[in-house]
Curated annotation (Swiss-Prot):
UniProt region (PPP2CB binding site), positions on chain: 951-987
Intramembrane region residues: 716-727
Family: Belongs to the glutamate-gated ion channel (TC 1.A.10.1) family. NR3A/GRIN3A subfamily.
PTM comment text: N-glycosylated.
UniProt-recorded name of the protein: Glutamate receptor ionotropic, NMDA 3A
Listed transmembrane segments: 675-694, 742-761, 933-948
Region of interest: GIT1-binding: 1082-1115
Organism of origin: Mus musculus (Mouse)
Domain of life assignment: Eukaryota
GO CC, alphabetical: cytoplasm; glutamatergic synapse; neuron projection; neuronal cell body; NMDA selective glutamate receptor complex; postsynaptic density membrane; postsynaptic membrane; presynapse
């Protein structure tokens, strides 16, 4: 409560004493401002509304005619508006330029005030829309994100009503002031406006606006062509006169004459009707001035002969009486014609001072044909009508913004919104706002805006004063002598015109200049190397590194250096070379000067510190150096104390970080192809497999049951196996398709896989090596810089333009980074590259950082983020140096002729780090960490294989019995042959011929009977379905033929006895003669055979075969016993 009471008391005091309190409140920090008034902002719709009345178009006359008509007097009044017929805006005017940006400085095609020879129409309505659109783009103009809105009065042909071509600006909008007041209330005031902008064209309209402001207590700002005299000073009614700016030429010219004590003068007029009344009145009111004569050459300009004879007579008459000639109404062509003629025929007296009384355009000033000592003045930009309208709107916006920070309710909520109920409080919102209007000053588009005497808003342009002099090379050049500000001349420095006239003969053959140049080591702009044994530089320029800025020490060192007995210590000598040294040498050759070069003692660019400038700026200001050539950034603070040439190198600020190599993550082997490519490959694979299956089963030559009696079936699983084998280059056994279409599609898929695999292989090595990680910073506005986390370190070079930018734009960030700032750029780069690094980010000029990145042998540096703070490098010179314009002109020529490009290619043409060639073993050597993902993938495969095994058992034990018992879908050959056989376990293979060397094929629970070569009948009785390797038993059912099995003995009798023993005594079960089952090539049995082979028959046959095997085993055992006994008997007999 105490704090609120203090602010309330301070606001009341400020209302009583506005001027001093404006300075006090300017120093109040933003943190102490009024909290955001949410309810007030909601009531006004987050917008400040400004009303607009008297929006009829203006029709202006030519400058000369209009000013001659009214005598050029700013106070001339007209009760009736100027003549002219109002017309609606043409399609090409008005809204066609409403989208112009603020920095565009006006709409395209805008006419400058007073420019042109014919009448022109000014459109207040369009100018207001243009001003509101531009001002709403200015950040921070209004607090709390408020916006400006203009409420236009609905008049004839204006506002939201249809245009009326018959309307005339001369006809009054309302018949009397009270009707006008009522109309304003009903159309503008009811919408809650903070102020009114008006464009009156007569004294009667001014009186109406006086009435509105007095009755409704609303500030009114009238924009008029001429200042209207008023009997009463109403603080609520201000007027901005456009004619004030047009009549300033006379004030500037009189000030120039007074400054040089040129009180005796003559006038030379190129246009007879040119208005010089203002100038004549000013000189007549000053008793020191004496007008000798007026030379009017208007009638003689058409003929060169007449002009020559006329000037010869007139100038001869004033040769001994007039030291000064002031010219009015002359364009640059006429001026050049007059001076060339005077110089050629010697008409002009040698000591005559020439002054151009009219404001000149700086872009049109030339030196050819003009005399030395000529004085001119002008503005860098010419004001247009729209600029004054925008400045008036900005004046209201700034006043509202200042008032809102003290009492937002009184500043934002209009006191008058109903004319029938006008509040009679002690202090209305309009009266409160008018006090801030009277104390608001700013630099606008039309000039310096300020309020004089509480009712007159003035827009004063700063005129610059130029003098034509010779430069040190003997060439004419325009030198700025000063400026006209606030009604007086503020001189810079330079040679006075009379001094130039006195010494002009000395500049025709100037001596060679000798300059002292200071530089600063900054790669690639300035390098240094050691001198040779003799203290000389075989290449580059000899420079001194004295480690001091003392001018006396430098004088002694350079004196000793140029003397015959050189005593400068060799430790002070260096060889300087680089981008800027080449530029300096070229400038010295073209401008014919010599130079001494030294390195700045403190190694700083220059900053204001401890009450003085340091570094390069300090050397220039102290006179130690005449020129500073290095990567010298042009900024506002330096430009205010020294001169800069036009920039020879454009750059910005950047952020440098260090990269770190890391191993590729687990899924890095997938990175060579995008996930969409992987998805596309596997989708294409399965689609190809489907089409391969369809083509094979629909073809008459396919590997299908309906095909050409094939032994195998090409199913969908076979197609998948083919596609996967081709994709991964697997050399496993596959069943290729047999039809022609399938083979063509398979080869097409192989080509597709070849290109995909080669692309993957080409990118795999680069990906598997690993990526480089770094601090990702989006730019200077990155949260890591504004809210640095624990341990995040960043800095810049001390007393550099980068530090100055951060200090002014981001004070809190600058306070944090001060501890990490480094003395020079190489130090910051080294801090980044150290292990462990001392900096995480380094902010500096991007031109310097790019070079450091390009020469980094380890490829550890990288610039990140968007560039910011666009700036340029210029050559620094002492203030008001006559060399500034000449060097700037030469730099422009170097740019246009390509010399600067040659320097850039020479010193920046370094092979980028990313394009260097490294050893293959260094770049592509990969360990197990790079393939960790593949090992993980293999482990996952092992786990999936276990799941697959479990799935097979689930299918075999649960799914197959259910399909057998309940499902009617028993045919699965098109999907999987193995699955089909598992469902159909009882079928007979067809009878096939057998041979001695051919293996008999297996079957399930069936007997195959084959004929051998000796017509022996062999029977095969396989086991039940026990697996792929089935036990086969051969039965010799007919051994009485010639091709019988025999045992071989040494004794022929025994051999015959044993060999003829047969197994016919073993009763074999009678064999049934069965018809061969009719089978297809894929093993599918006929339905009749399946029904005939019952389980009981098979069991009986098995039992019989078991008995046969038992008997054969018994015979074999007994036979073995006999053979062993026979062997023992033979051995006993032999012994």
């Amino acid at each position: 409560m105490r704090r609120l009471s203090l602010w309330w008391l301070l606001s009341r005091v400020c209302l009583l004493l506005p001027p001093p309190c404006a300075l006090v409140l300017a120093g109040v920090p933003s943190s102490s401002s009024h909290p955001q008034p949410c309810q007030i902002l909601k009531r006004i719709g987050h917008a400040v509304r400004v009303g607009a009345v008297h929006l009829q178009p203006w029709t202006t006359a030519p400058r000369a005619a209009s000013r001659a008509q009214d005598g050029g007097r700013a106070g001339a009044q007209r009760d009736e508006p100027e003549s002219g017929t109002w017309r609606p805006p043409a399609p090409s005017q008005g809204a066609r330029w409403l989208g112009s940006a603020l920095h565009g400085r006006g709409p395209p095609g805008s006419r400058k005030l007073g420019e042109g020879a014919g009448t022109e129409t000014l459109w207040p309505r369009d100018a207001l829309l243009f001003a509101v659109e531009n001002l709403n783009r200015v950040e921070g103009l209004l607090p709390y994100n408020l916006s400006l809105e203009v409420v236009m009065a609905i008049e004839a042909g204006l506002g939201d009503l249809p245009l009326m071509p018959f309307s005339s600006p001369s006809s009054p909008w309302s018949s009397d002031p009270f009707s006008f007041l009522q109309s304003v209330c009903h159309t503008v005031v009811v919408q809650g406006v903070s102020a009114l902008l008006a464009f009156p064209q007569s004294q009667g309209e001014m009186m109406e606006l006086d009435l509105v402001s007095s009755v409704l207590h609303i500030p009114v700002l009238s924009i008029v062509r001429h200042e209207f005299p008023r009997e009463s000073q109403n603080p609520l009614h201000l007027q901005l006169s456009l004619e004030n700016s047009l009549s300033s030429d006379a004030d500037v010219t009189v000030s120039i004459l007074t400054m040089n004590n040129w009180y005796n003068f003559s006038l030379l007029l190129c246009q007879e009707d040119w208005n010089i009344t203002d100038f004549l009145l000013l000189t007549e009111n000053n008793s020191k001035f004496h007008l000798e004569s007026i030379i009017n050459i208007t009638a003689n300009l058409s003929s060169t002969k007449d002009l020559l004879s006329f000037l010869q007579v007139q100038l001869e008459n004033i040769r001994n009486s007039t030291p000064t000639m002031v010219m009015f109404g002359c364009d640059m062509g006429s001026i050049r014609q007059i001076f060339e003629m005077s110089t050629q025929f010697g008409l002009s007296p040698p000591d005559l001072h020439w002054v151009l009384g009219d404001s000149q355009n700086v872009e049109e000033l030339r030196t050819e044909g003009l005399p030395l000592g000529l004085i001119a003045h002008g503005k860098t930009t010419q004001s247009v009508f729209e600029y004054y309208v925008q400045d008036a709107m900005e004046l209201v916006a700034r006043a509202v913004a200042t008032a809102t920070m003290i009492q937002p309710e009184l500043a934002l909520l209009p006191s008058t919104m109903n004319c029938m109920d006008v509040k009679t409080t002690n202090l209305t919102s309009g009266q409160y706002l008018s006090r801030f209007l009277a104390n608001t000053t700013f630099r606008g588009l039309s000039g310096s805006i300020k309020v004089k005497g509480s009712t007159i808003v003035s827009s004063e342009n700063n005129f610059f004063i130029w003098n034509l002099q010779y430069d040190p090379m003997g060439k004419p050049m325009w030198t700025r002598l000063g400026s006209w500000q606030g009604g007086r001349i503020v001189m810079d420095s330079g040679i006075w015109p009379e001094q130039a006239q006195r010494h002009k003969t000395h500049f025709h053959h100037p001596n060679k200049l000798h300059l002292r140049v200071v530089t600063l080591i900054e790669h690639p702009f300035v390098f240094t190397r050691e001198v040779d044994d003799e203290g000389l530089c075989p290449a580059g320029q000899l420079c001194l590194d004295p480690m001091t800025n003392d001018s006396s020490i430098l004088d002694s060192l350079f004196s000793s250096l140029h003397s015959s007995n050189d005593t400068v210590p060799i430790k002070f000598k260096k060889c300087c070379y680089g981008y800027c040294i080449d530029l300096l040498e070229q400038l010295a050759e073209d401008m014919n000067f010599d130079f001494d070069l030294y390195i700045v003692g403190d190694g700083k660019y220059g900053a204001w510190k401890n009450g003085h400038w340091t570094g390069l700026v300090g050397d220039l200001l102290s006179g130690t150096a005449n020129m500073a050539v290095t990567s010298f950034s042009i900024n506002t603070a330096r430009s205010q104390v020294i001169d800069f040439t036009s920039p020879f190198f454009s750059t910005s600020l950047g952020i440098l970080v260090r990269t770190r190599d890391t191993a590729a993550p687990i899924g890095a082997f997938m990175w060579p192809l995008h996930w969409t490519m992987w998805l596309g490959i596997f989708v294409a694979l399965h689609i190809t497999a489907i089409f391969l299956t369809l083509y094979e089963w629909k073809s008459p030559f396919g590997m299908t049951p309906k095909g050409r009696n094939r032994n195998k079936v090409f199913s969908f699983s076979s197609a998948l196996n083919v596609c996967y084998a081709l994709l991964f280059g697997r050399t496993a056994a596959i069943k290729p398709p047999k039809c022609w279409t399938g083979r063509f599609l398979m080869n097409l898929w192989a080509i597709f896989c070849m290109f995909c695999l080669s692309t993957y292989t080409a990118n795999l090595a680069a990906v598997m090596v690993g990526e480089k990680i770094y601090e990702e910073l989006s730019g200077i506005h990155d949260p890591k810089l504004h809210h640095p986390s624990q341990g995040f370190r960043f800095g810049t070079v001390r007393e550099s333009s980068a530090e100055d930018y951060v200090r002014q734009s981001f004070p809190e960030m600058h306070e944090y980074m001060r501890r990490y700032n480094v003395p020079a750029t190489p130090d910051g780069v080294q801090y980044l590259k150290n292990d462990p690094e001392k900096l995480d980010a380094f902010i500096m000029d991007k031109a310097l950082l790019d070079y450091e990145v390009s020469i980094d042998a380890d490829c550890k540096l990288l610039t990140v983020g968007k560039p910011f703070a666009i700036e340029g490098y210029g050559i620094g010179l002492p203030p008001n140096s006559p060399l500034t314009s000449n060097i700037s002109e030469l730099i422009s020529q170097y740019k246009s002729h390509g010399f600067m490009d040659v320097l850039h290619d020479k010193w920046y043409k370094v092979v980028p780090c990313g394009k260097r060639s490294f050893a293959v073993t260094e770049t592509l050597q990969m360990g197990i960490k790079h393939f960790s993902g593949l090992f993980v993938l293999l482990c996952i495969g092992f786990g999936l294989s276990i799941l697959t095994t479990i799935g097979e058992h689930i299918v075999y034990r649960l799914l197959l019995p259910r399909i057998k018992n309940k499902s009617k879908l028993q045919y699965w050959l098109h999907t999987s042959q193995r699955f089909h056989r598992a469902l159909n376990t009882s079928f007979v293979e067809e009878k096939q011929p057998c041979s001695k060397t051919k293996r008999v094929e297996k079957s399930r629970w069936r007997r195959w009977t084959c004929k051998t070569e000796g017509d022996s009948e062999l029977s095969l009785f396989p086991r039940s379905n026990m697996g792929p390797q089935q036990l086969m038993v051969w039965n010799t059912s007919n051994l009485s033929h010639d091709n019988q099995r025999k045992y071989i003995f040494n004794d022929e009798e025994g051999q015959n006895q044993l060999g003829t023993q047969t197994h016919q005594d073993i009763p074999l079960p009678p064999r049934r003669r069965e018809l061969p089952a009719s089978l297809t090539t894929n093993g599918k049995a006929d339905s009749l055979n399946v029904a005939r082979n019952s389980v009981m028959q098979e069991l009986s046959e098995l039992e019989k075969q078991i008995q046969v095997i038992r008997q054969e085993l018994q015979l074999a055992v007994s036979r073995k016993t006999e053979l062993e006994e026979y062997q023992r008997t033979n051995r006993t007999c032999e012994s």
